[in-house]
Amino acid sequence: MRLTMRRTLMTGFFQRLQKETQAAQQQMLQAPVFAACARGEITLDMYLSFLTQAYHHVKHTVPLLMACGGRLSDRYEWVRIAIADYIDEEKGHQEWILNDIRVCGGDAQAVRNNQGVGQVSTPIELMVAYLYHQIDRANPLALFGMVWVLEGTSVGVGGNIARLVKQQLNLPAKAMSYLTSHSELDQDHIRFFESLMDKITAEEDRQAIIHSANQVFYLYGQMLRELLPQTQQQAA
Protein backbone atom coordinates (compact mmCIF):
# COMPACT_ATOMS: atom_id res chain seq x y z
CA MET A 1 0.00 0.00 0.00
CA ARG A 2 2.80 2.40 0.88
CA LEU A 3 4.56 1.78 -2.46
CA THR A 4 1.31 2.36 -4.36
CA MET A 5 0.66 5.62 -2.57
CA ARG A 6 4.19 6.84 -3.21
CA ARG A 7 3.85 6.07 -6.92
CA THR A 8 0.55 7.97 -7.03
CA LEU A 9 2.10 11.00 -5.37
CA MET A 10 4.97 10.99 -7.86
CA THR A 11 2.62 10.97 -10.84
CA GLY A 12 2.32 14.53 -12.08
CA PHE A 13 -0.66 16.22 -13.67
CA PHE A 14 0.85 16.01 -17.15
CA GLN A 15 0.56 12.23 -17.09
CA ARG A 16 -3.05 12.48 -15.98
CA LEU A 17 -3.75 15.02 -18.72
CA GLN A 18 -2.41 12.60 -21.31
CA LYS A 19 -4.50 9.75 -19.95
CA GLU A 20 -7.78 11.64 -19.62
CA THR A 21 -7.57 13.13 -23.11
CA GLN A 22 -6.31 10.00 -24.87
CA ALA A 23 -9.72 8.95 -26.17
CA ALA A 24 -10.38 12.39 -27.68
CA GLN A 25 -6.89 12.44 -29.16
CA GLN A 26 -7.37 9.05 -30.80
CA GLN A 27 -10.73 10.16 -32.18
CA MET A 28 -9.03 13.17 -33.76
CA LEU A 29 -6.35 10.94 -35.28
CA GLN A 30 -9.10 8.91 -36.98
CA ALA A 31 -9.77 11.86 -39.31
CA PRO A 32 -9.59 10.42 -42.86
CA VAL A 33 -6.90 12.90 -43.89
CA PHE A 34 -4.27 10.93 -41.94
CA ALA A 35 -5.03 7.70 -43.82
CA ALA A 36 -5.15 9.60 -47.12
CA CYS A 37 -1.73 11.05 -46.41
CA ALA A 38 -0.32 7.61 -45.61
CA ARG A 39 -1.75 6.26 -48.91
CA GLY A 40 -0.14 9.06 -50.89
CA GLU A 41 -3.46 10.74 -51.68
CA ILE A 42 -2.69 14.18 -50.30
CA THR A 43 -3.28 17.05 -52.74
CA LEU A 44 -1.98 20.60 -52.89
CA ASP A 45 -5.51 21.91 -52.31
CA MET A 46 -5.75 19.86 -49.11
CA TYR A 47 -2.41 21.18 -47.89
CA LEU A 48 -3.46 24.76 -48.68
CA SER A 49 -6.74 24.20 -46.83
CA PHE A 50 -4.81 22.99 -43.79
CA LEU A 51 -2.49 26.01 -43.90
CA THR A 52 -5.50 28.31 -44.21
CA GLN A 53 -7.08 26.94 -41.06
CA ALA A 54 -3.72 26.90 -39.28
CA TYR A 55 -3.41 30.62 -39.99
CA HIS A 56 -6.84 31.32 -38.55
CA HIS A 57 -5.99 29.78 -35.19
CA VAL A 58 -2.26 30.57 -35.03
CA LYS A 59 -2.93 34.30 -35.46
CA HIS A 60 -4.83 34.12 -32.16
CA THR A 61 -2.08 32.34 -30.21
CA VAL A 62 -0.35 35.47 -28.91
CA PRO A 63 -3.62 37.38 -28.20
CA LEU A 64 -4.95 34.33 -26.33
CA LEU A 65 -1.76 34.03 -24.29
CA MET A 66 -1.88 37.73 -23.46
CA ALA A 67 -5.53 37.48 -22.43
CA CYS A 68 -4.79 34.44 -20.28
CA GLY A 69 -1.89 36.17 -18.54
CA GLY A 70 -4.03 39.19 -17.79
CA ARG A 71 -6.77 37.10 -16.16
CA LEU A 72 -4.56 34.97 -13.91
CA SER A 73 -4.62 35.56 -10.16
CA ASP A 74 -1.49 36.50 -8.21
CA ARG A 75 -0.95 32.92 -7.09
CA TYR A 76 -0.23 32.05 -10.71
CA GLU A 77 2.40 34.74 -11.24
CA TRP A 78 4.85 31.96 -12.17
CA VAL A 79 2.51 30.92 -14.98
CA ARG A 80 2.35 34.53 -16.18
CA ILE A 81 6.15 34.55 -16.43
CA ALA A 82 6.03 31.30 -18.44
CA ILE A 83 3.40 32.85 -20.71
CA ALA A 84 5.79 35.72 -21.48
CA ASP A 85 8.29 33.12 -22.72
CA TYR A 86 5.58 31.42 -24.78
CA ILE A 87 4.65 34.74 -26.39
CA ASP A 88 8.25 35.40 -27.35
CA GLU A 89 8.43 31.95 -28.98
CA GLU A 90 5.09 32.15 -30.80
CA LYS A 91 4.94 35.69 -32.15
CA GLY A 92 4.90 36.04 -35.92
CA HIS A 93 4.26 32.38 -36.73
CA GLN A 94 1.12 33.26 -38.68
CA GLU A 95 3.36 35.06 -41.18
CA TRP A 96 5.31 31.84 -41.74
CA ILE A 97 2.04 30.23 -42.77
CA LEU A 98 1.19 32.99 -45.23
CA ASN A 99 4.65 32.65 -46.77
CA ASP A 100 4.12 28.89 -47.17
CA ILE A 101 0.79 29.58 -48.87
CA ARG A 102 2.43 32.02 -51.31
CA VAL A 103 5.17 29.55 -52.21
CA CYS A 104 2.49 26.93 -52.93
CA GLY A 105 0.70 29.34 -55.25
CA GLY A 106 -2.19 29.99 -52.87
CA ASP A 107 -3.97 33.28 -52.22
CA ALA A 108 -2.33 34.48 -49.01
CA GLN A 109 -4.17 37.81 -49.13
CA ALA A 110 -7.55 36.06 -49.19
CA VAL A 111 -6.47 34.06 -46.15
CA ARG A 112 -5.27 37.16 -44.29
CA ASN A 113 -8.54 38.94 -45.08
CA ASN A 114 -10.71 35.89 -44.31
CA GLN A 115 -12.30 35.99 -47.77
CA GLY A 116 -13.34 33.37 -50.32
CA VAL A 117 -11.08 30.31 -50.29
CA GLY A 118 -9.24 31.89 -47.36
CA GLN A 119 -12.17 31.86 -44.95
CA VAL A 120 -11.98 30.33 -41.50
CA SER A 121 -13.87 27.04 -41.08
CA THR A 122 -16.67 26.70 -38.56
CA PRO A 123 -14.75 24.30 -36.26
CA ILE A 124 -11.76 26.65 -36.01
CA GLU A 125 -13.96 29.70 -35.51
CA LEU A 126 -15.77 27.87 -32.71
CA MET A 127 -12.50 26.64 -31.19
CA VAL A 128 -11.04 30.14 -30.97
CA ALA A 129 -14.29 31.62 -29.64
CA TYR A 130 -14.49 28.84 -27.02
CA LEU A 131 -10.98 29.61 -25.78
CA TYR A 132 -11.64 33.35 -25.48
CA HIS A 133 -14.85 32.56 -23.60
CA GLN A 134 -13.06 30.23 -21.19
CA ILE A 135 -10.42 32.86 -20.47
CA ASP A 136 -12.93 35.69 -20.01
CA ARG A 137 -15.81 33.92 -18.27
CA ALA A 138 -14.56 30.66 -16.79
CA ASN A 139 -10.93 29.66 -16.08
CA PRO A 140 -8.02 31.25 -17.98
CA LEU A 141 -5.89 28.13 -17.43
CA ALA A 142 -8.21 26.36 -19.88
CA LEU A 143 -5.99 27.82 -22.60
CA PHE A 144 -3.40 25.18 -21.75
CA GLY A 145 -5.81 22.55 -23.03
CA MET A 146 -5.26 24.02 -26.49
CA VAL A 147 -1.50 24.11 -25.94
CA TRP A 148 -1.54 20.39 -25.17
CA VAL A 149 -3.60 19.55 -28.26
CA LEU A 150 -1.51 21.53 -30.73
CA GLU A 151 1.96 20.90 -29.34
CA GLY A 152 1.23 17.29 -28.44
CA THR A 153 -0.06 16.64 -31.96
CA SER A 154 2.98 18.34 -33.52
CA VAL A 155 5.34 16.14 -31.54
CA GLY A 156 3.28 12.98 -31.99
CA VAL A 157 2.52 13.02 -35.72
CA GLY A 158 3.60 16.39 -37.12
CA GLY A 159 7.10 15.38 -38.19
CA ASN A 160 5.95 12.30 -40.08
CA ILE A 161 3.09 14.16 -41.77
CA ALA A 162 5.47 16.94 -42.80
CA ARG A 163 7.78 14.42 -44.47
CA LEU A 164 4.91 12.72 -46.29
CA VAL A 165 3.46 15.99 -47.55
CA LYS A 166 6.85 17.23 -48.76
CA GLN A 167 7.56 13.96 -50.59
CA GLN A 168 4.13 13.49 -52.13
CA LEU A 169 3.74 17.07 -53.33
CA ASN A 170 7.43 17.54 -54.15
CA LEU A 171 7.47 20.84 -52.29
CA PRO A 172 10.54 22.95 -51.54
CA ALA A 173 11.56 23.42 -47.92
CA LYS A 174 10.40 27.05 -48.02
CA ALA A 175 6.82 25.81 -48.58
CA MET A 176 6.99 23.75 -45.38
CA SER A 177 8.32 26.25 -42.84
CA TYR A 178 5.31 26.13 -40.50
CA LEU A 179 4.70 22.38 -40.47
CA THR A 180 8.37 21.41 -40.30
CA SER A 181 9.47 24.00 -37.76
CA HIS A 182 6.62 23.24 -35.38
CA SER A 183 7.27 19.50 -35.38
CA GLU A 184 10.87 20.33 -34.38
CA LEU A 185 10.33 23.31 -32.07
CA ASP A 186 7.55 21.62 -30.14
CA GLN A 187 9.89 18.84 -28.96
CA ASP A 188 11.40 21.38 -26.56
CA HIS A 189 8.07 23.07 -25.93
CA ILE A 190 6.43 19.85 -24.77
CA ARG A 191 9.12 19.24 -22.15
CA PHE A 192 8.61 22.76 -20.84
CA PHE A 193 4.85 22.26 -20.95
CA GLU A 194 5.14 19.03 -18.94
CA SER A 195 7.12 20.76 -16.19
CA LEU A 196 4.58 23.59 -16.14
CA MET A 197 1.56 21.29 -15.90
CA ASP A 198 3.10 19.24 -13.11
CA LYS A 199 3.09 22.38 -10.95
CA ILE A 200 -0.69 22.81 -11.31
CA THR A 201 -2.13 21.36 -8.10
CA ALA A 202 -5.64 22.82 -7.73
CA GLU A 203 -8.23 20.26 -8.85
CA GLU A 204 -10.58 22.83 -10.41
CA ASP A 205 -7.75 24.12 -12.57
CA ARG A 206 -6.73 20.63 -13.61
CA GLN A 207 -10.32 19.85 -14.57
CA ALA A 208 -10.55 23.04 -16.61
CA ILE A 209 -7.43 22.13 -18.60
CA ILE A 210 -8.59 18.55 -19.20
CA HIS A 211 -12.06 19.64 -20.30
CA SER A 212 -10.66 22.29 -22.61
CA ALA A 213 -8.23 19.82 -24.20
CA ASN A 214 -11.04 17.37 -24.92
CA GLN A 215 -13.14 20.11 -26.50
CA VAL A 216 -10.25 21.33 -28.64
CA PHE A 217 -9.37 17.79 -29.75
CA TYR A 218 -12.96 17.44 -30.96
CA LEU A 219 -13.11 20.77 -32.79
CA TYR A 220 -9.64 20.44 -34.31
CA GLY A 221 -10.59 16.95 -35.44
CA GLN A 222 -13.70 18.33 -37.12
CA MET A 223 -11.52 20.77 -39.05
CA LEU A 224 -9.24 17.93 -40.15
CA ARG A 225 -12.24 15.92 -41.32
CA GLU A 226 -13.31 18.80 -43.54
CA LEU A 227 -9.95 18.81 -45.36
CA LEU A 228 -10.83 15.68 -47.31
CA PRO A 229 -13.47 15.97 -50.06
CA GLN A 230 -16.64 14.03 -49.24
CA THR A 231 -16.05 11.50 -52.04
CA GLN A 232 -12.61 10.64 -50.66
CA GLN A 233 -13.98 10.39 -47.12
CA GLN A 234 -16.47 7.77 -48.28
CA ALA A 235 -13.67 5.83 -49.98
CA ALA A 236 -11.51 6.07 -46.85
Question: Predicted regions: what is each one?
Answer:
Residues 3-236:
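Non-heme di-metal
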